């Protein structure tokens, strides 16, 4: 048992059928023909068996798909006559494996049966004698001397060609008495004539490529129009949608569910897209912080009245902890009940019901003050008085006391001072504007206007900064 000899086959093929060599003896030719036919039979049997297996596999896959189709068709026929709404949930992922199965060749795993050992036969016949004439005839049909070397490409050579092997120096490459390399570029020159030859710099300057001509827009001074960039954004358009007047409910329709109700508010459509449409956020029912307006009466914070009835105005403006207390509040109108009577018996240390937590139990003075200011909404909502207003009130009170003190004298200077004070109040808008016209006569008023204001009499020297006249 010996392995087969050299086989002539194509590259990449699993099977290789051997060829029968010419000029064999009769017994050798018969044996090789039988072996080749037997090998070909094995190869063909293997190929057809593999094809049959692949066909059976494809048939089983088609049968499974057909069963799924018939099952889906039966389900559709079952629910076709139903009048109830049916929800169909589609899978979020495509029903396919994450990694696709690679395609396998039908000849994957096939082995060449020719690699198996075949029986060795002994032939008794002798070789035929050599015939020279027959060999010469075969040379006409079977070329023996084939030049497999690729032919070199014909290159256009300007010089003498390749360098000879007997050149020993670089000067042998140059033409006598010149700088021309004849092996690179052959030129006809007289070495003894002393002709000036072109240098390599000059030759390079001649062969230097020139720039292309300027475009027509530059050469002819033409003005190119600016190209408007194309808009590639997707802008869907529904066009003219006709208004169809149909009834909202059509009973007893085949294939239409009766228990399905559609909501009229389906939200904004997806086409055409509204670039500036902002969806409305859901409303959350939360408690809105009301501005804090504490009432200070007799050193005790009073609770704010309940929300349903309108709260009466506070008898005194709110005062923070870090600000000195204001003068006694004015009396409330006769129509409103007094709050101080009800809350007078309450202890100052007890917390007031309904007051914010920060006021009842402050954690730190500064944080509580800032938080109460934020809840109150600032000066505009809390109706807090500034220090400047309190100074003005103090000035008014002192002026009134001075007017009362000077009005008791009855002299000319005190009357003049009173008239000037009333005149200045009317001009500045801080008092009644008719104060100057209530005098005994117009001449006295004109005289009071022409006299500059005098400093108030009996003014203590330590209160000059606080009692300056307001312009």
Swiss-Prot record:
<keyword id="KW-0206">Cytoskeleton</keyword>
<protein>
    <recommendedName>
        <fullName>WASH complex subunit 1</fullName>
    </recommendedName>
</protein>
<feature type="region of interest" description="Disordered">
    <location>
        <begin position="297"/>
        <end position="471"/>
    </location>
</feature>
<dbReference type="GO" id="GO:0015031">
    <property type="term" value="P:protein transport"/>
</dbReference>
<dbReference type="GO" id="GO:0005776">
    <property type="term" value="C:autophagosome"/>
</dbReference>
<dbReference type="GO" id="GO:0005814">
    <property type="term" value="C:centriole"/>
</dbReference>
<keyword id="KW-0968">Cytoplasmic vesicle</keyword>
<dbReference type="GO" id="GO:0043015">
    <property type="term" value="F:gamma-tubulin binding"/>
</dbReference>
<dbReference type="GO" id="GO:0032456">
    <property type="term" value="P:endocytic recycling"/>
</dbReference>
<comment type="similarity">
    <text>Belongs to the WASH1 family.</text>
</comment>
<dbReference type="InterPro" id="IPR028290">
    <property type="entry name" value="WASH1"/>
</dbReference>
<keyword id="KW-0009">Actin-binding</keyword>
<dbReference type="GO" id="GO:0071203">
    <property type="term" value="C:WASH complex"/>
</dbReference>
<feature type="compositionally biased region" description="Pro residues">
    <location>
        <begin position="304"/>
        <end position="336"/>
    </location>
</feature>
<feature type="domain" description="WH2">
    <location>
        <begin position="365"/>
        <end position="387"/>
    </location>
</feature>
<dbReference type="GO" id="GO:0034314">
    <property type="term" value="P:Arp2/3 complex-mediated actin nucleation"/>
</dbReference>
<dbReference type="GO" id="GO:0003779">
    <property type="term" value="F:actin binding"/>
</dbReference>
<dbReference type="GO" id="GO:0042147">
    <property type="term" value="P:retrograde transport, endosome to Golgi"/>
</dbReference>
<keyword id="KW-0963">Cytoplasm</keyword>
<dbReference type="Pfam" id="PF11945">
    <property type="entry name" value="WASH_WAHD"/>
</dbReference>
<dbReference type="GO" id="GO:0005770">
    <property type="term" value="C:late endosome"/>
</dbReference>
<feature type="region of interest" description="WHD1">
    <location>
        <begin position="1"/>
        <end position="167"/>
    </location>
</feature>
<dbReference type="GO" id="GO:0005769">
    <property type="term" value="C:early endosome"/>
</dbReference>
<dbReference type="GO" id="GO:0031901">
    <property type="term" value="C:early endosome membrane"/>
</dbReference>
<comment type="subunit">
    <text>Component of the WASH core complex also described as WASH regulatory complex SHRC composed of WASHC1, WASHC2, WASHC3, WASHC4 and WASHC5. The WASH core complex associates with the F-actin-capping protein dimer (formed by CAPZA1, CAPZA2 or CAPZA3 and CAPZB); the assembly has been initially described as WASH complex. Interacts (via WHD1 region) with WASHC2; the interaction is direct. Interacts with alpha-tubulin. Interacts with BECN1; WASHC1 and AMBRA1 can competitively interact with BECN1. Interacts with BLOC1S2; may associate with the BLOC-1 complex.</text>
</comment>
<keyword id="KW-0472">Membrane</keyword>
<dbReference type="GO" id="GO:0055037">
    <property type="term" value="C:recycling endosome"/>
</dbReference>
<feature type="region of interest" description="VCA">
    <location>
        <begin position="353"/>
        <end position="471"/>
    </location>
</feature>
<feature type="compositionally biased region" description="Acidic residues">
    <location>
        <begin position="462"/>
        <end position="471"/>
    </location>
</feature>
<dbReference type="GO" id="GO:0005829">
    <property type="term" value="C:cytosol"/>
</dbReference>
<dbReference type="GO" id="GO:0016197">
    <property type="term" value="P:endosomal transport"/>
</dbReference>
<keyword id="KW-0967">Endosome</keyword>
<feature type="compositionally biased region" description="Basic and acidic residues">
    <location>
        <begin position="386"/>
        <end position="402"/>
    </location>
</feature>
<dbReference type="InterPro" id="IPR003124">
    <property type="entry name" value="WH2_dom"/>
</dbReference>
<feature type="compositionally biased region" description="Gly residues">
    <location>
        <begin position="428"/>
        <end position="442"/>
    </location>
</feature>
<keyword id="KW-0653">Protein transport</keyword>
<keyword id="KW-0813">Transport</keyword>
<dbReference type="InterPro" id="IPR021854">
    <property type="entry name" value="WASH1_WAHD"/>
</dbReference>
<comment type="function">
    <text>Acts as a component of the WASH core complex that functions as a nucleation-promoting factor (NPF) at the surface of endosomes, where it recruits and activates the Arp2/3 complex to induce actin polymerization, playing a key role in the fission of tubules that serve as transport intermediates during endosome sorting. Involved in endocytic trafficking of EGF. Involved in transferrin receptor recycling. Regulates the trafficking of endosomal alpha5beta1 integrin to the plasma membrane and involved in invasive cell migration.</text>
</comment>
<dbReference type="GO" id="GO:0055038">
    <property type="term" value="C:recycling endosome membrane"/>
</dbReference>
<dbReference type="GO" id="GO:0043014">
    <property type="term" value="F:alpha-tubulin binding"/>
</dbReference>
<dbReference type="GO" id="GO:0006887">
    <property type="term" value="P:exocytosis"/>
</dbReference>
